[in-house]
């Protein structure tokens, strides 16, 4: 039986978000739960860490858990930056933090296995979504329960994605009509496309605290039987 009753929209039980904020990535900073971001995408490297558990080559990766490592990469080639090795005169990967998993040693070695296929940073195996280029705060007010929550969301996210973020606070969020300024919101569009402007830069220009005016979305309950 569908959990969402008569409400139109995506299957939220199997919903995949497209965007993650930098603060969300930063939460995944443990050995058993390690994410990083680079070149606009977010990657879950936990399986890689598990595979090479105990290997010293993991150290540079563990040191940047939950961080953006775009500076490791050449944005043109999307490969790890390279330089001329002063010892060999050969082109090598530049790894100032030390060599890490799938980076070849500076000199030929018989104990280095290169049969791993595609290096972890080149494929999409670990990719979980995009990094939000810009974030903003939004207030969501449940008019039925008179509860208010402030969420940080990505500016590129659709209302469905924002609703998915809100589910921990209200499991029946899809059973509500979402409104702003008296108008129903198009759940397939972003906040900006729905006319909810991000005025943070204007507040900064005026030396005013933008938190004093965080847009509020009002939720009105629909009796769609999902509470049964």
Curated annotation (Swiss-Prot):
GO cellular component, one term: cytoplasm
Domain annotation Cytochrome b5 heme-binding: ranges: 17-83
PROSITE patterns associated with the record: CYTOCHROME_B5_2
Coiled coil: none
InterPro entries named among the record's database cross-references: Cyt_B5-like_heme/steroid-bd (IPR001199), Cyt_B5-like_heme/steroid_sf (IPR036400), Cytochrome_b5_domain (IPR052320)
A Pfam family it matches: Cyt-b5
Location of this chain's protein in the cell: Cytoplasm, Cytoskeleton, Cilium axoneme
Principal location listed in the UniProt entry: cytoplasm
Binding locations of heme: 83
Record-level GO BP terms: regulation of cilium beat frequency
One annotated GO molecular function: metal ion binding
UniProt keywords, alphabetically: Cell projection, Cytoplasm, Cytoskeleton, Heme, Iron, Metal-binding
Keyword Ribonucleoprotein: no
Primary role: Radial spoke stalk protein that binds heme under oxidizing conditions. Required for the coordinated beating of multiple cilia maybe by functioning in a redox signaling pathway.
PANTHER family listed in its UniProt record: CYTOCHROME B5 DOMAIN-CONTAINING PROTEIN 1 (PTHR21281:SF0)
Family that this chain belongs to: Belongs to the cytochrome b5 family.
This protein's name: Cytochrome b5 domain-containing protein 1
């Amino acid at each position: 039986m569908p959990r969402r009753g008569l409400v139109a929209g995506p299957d939220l039980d199997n919903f995949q978000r497209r965007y993650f904020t930098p603060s969300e990535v930063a939460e995944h900073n443990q050995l058993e739960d390690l994410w990083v971001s680079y070149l606009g995408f977010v990657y879950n490297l936990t399986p890689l860490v598990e595979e090479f558990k105990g290997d010293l080559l993991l150290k540079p990766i563990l040191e940047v858990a939950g961080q953006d490592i775009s500076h490791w990469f050449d944005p043109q080639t999307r490969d790890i930056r390279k330089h001329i090795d002063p010892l060999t005169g050969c082109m090598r990967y530049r790894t100032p933090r030390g060599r890490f998993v799938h980076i070849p040693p500076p000199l030929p070695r018989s104990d280095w296995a290169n049969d791993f296929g595609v290096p972890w940073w080149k494929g999409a195996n670990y990719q979980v979504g995009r990094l939000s280029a810009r974030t903003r705060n939004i207030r969501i007010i449940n008019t039925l329960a008179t509860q208010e929550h402030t969420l940080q969301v990505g500016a590129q996210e659709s209302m469905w994605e924002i609703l998915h973020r809100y589910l921990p606070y209200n499991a029946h969020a899809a059973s509500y009509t979402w409104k702003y300024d008296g108008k129903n919101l198009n759940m397939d569009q972003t906040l900006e496309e729905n006319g909810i402007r991000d005025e943070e830069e204007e507040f900064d220009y005026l030396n005013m605290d933008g938190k004093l005016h965080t847009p509020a979305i009002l939720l009105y309950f629909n009796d769609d039987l999902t509470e049964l």
